[in-house]
Design a protein with these regions (language model features):
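ATP-dependent adenylation/nucleotidyltransferase module used to activate substrates
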Residues: 1-137
Length: 137
């Protein structure tokens, strides 16, 4: 399946890309929303500016949006717009994200995917922390 990856540049979003590729999926683009600050409820913030370099290294196109506030509605709208663009430009059928335990994030991402008629893949959801660290190492 052709996928977009919600990409913060952290280990979880990066490893989720690796996992879905192992499953046979094709990651067509990275979707990154740059929150205004670390106060975001939905999005990862530390070192997110490095995602542009990671995109080049991974050889996967990146589409981005930069926000003026950390309001949840603005973050959700930005993701919706980027996923519509990814669907149009890359013919994606689904979204992968690296969420592990946040029910709040999972529900938000599921809602956005449902509104965009996209499947959602969460290869790290509820993974045992010890097993996960062993996989990474």
């Amino acid at each position: 399946m052709k996928l977009a990856a919600l990409f913060s540049g952290g280990k979880d979003s990066t490893y989720s890309i690796y996992k879905v590729k192992q499953m046979g999926h094709d990651v067509k683009c990275l979707v990154t929303v740059f929150p205004k600050s670390s106060d975001s409820q939905l999005l990862h913030f530390p070192a997110i500016e490095l995602t542009k370099l990671q995109s080049k290294t991974l050889k996967i196109s990146q589409i981005t949006s930069t926000l003026d506030s950390n309001e949840l509605a603005e973050e959700m709208d930005a993701l919706k717009i980027l996923l519509k663009r990814a669907k149009q430009d890359f013919q994606i059928e689904g979204l992968v994200h690296g969420g592990i335990s946040s029910e709040f994030q999972k529900k938000c991402f599921e809602k956005i995917c449902k509104e965009n008629d996209l499947k959602i893949i969460t290869p790290l959801w509820k993974i045992n922390a010890k097993e996960y660290m062993n996989e990474l190492i």
